[in-house]
Amino acid sequence: MTIDMSQFFQVFFDEADELLAEMEKLLLALDVSAPDNEDLNAIFRAAHSIKGGAATFGFTDITEMTHMLESLLDRIRKGEMALTPEHVDVFLVAKDVLAMQMEGHHHGSSVDQDAVGSVCQRLKALSQDIV
């Protein structure tokens, strides 16, 4: 018996699209000076869910970026690092790049590797407090 993986792929892509939209909505509404912990947790969970699904299907590029995003969000939500407008900007750009990567896997469209590299560098710099 052969399992048709296409239906599972479609569920992953549909859910990831919803999670990215929710992430964007929450990021745009965040009060940087006093972020709501529940909103930070919801953004973290969205990144975590995308990472898990991407890992299941072997999408290592998405897994790597969401891991960096998730790690930085975790430090912020634990109070180890203050949220800044720069964080929100990078998170929004990362969300857009993740959407582009999803499209690449889903529809075979091209992915701007320079954009991916730039976001990864910015996430790494922010996680090391190097801005």
Features from the language model and the residues they span:
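N-terminal assembly/transducer modules of large multi-domain enzymes
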Residues: M1-V131
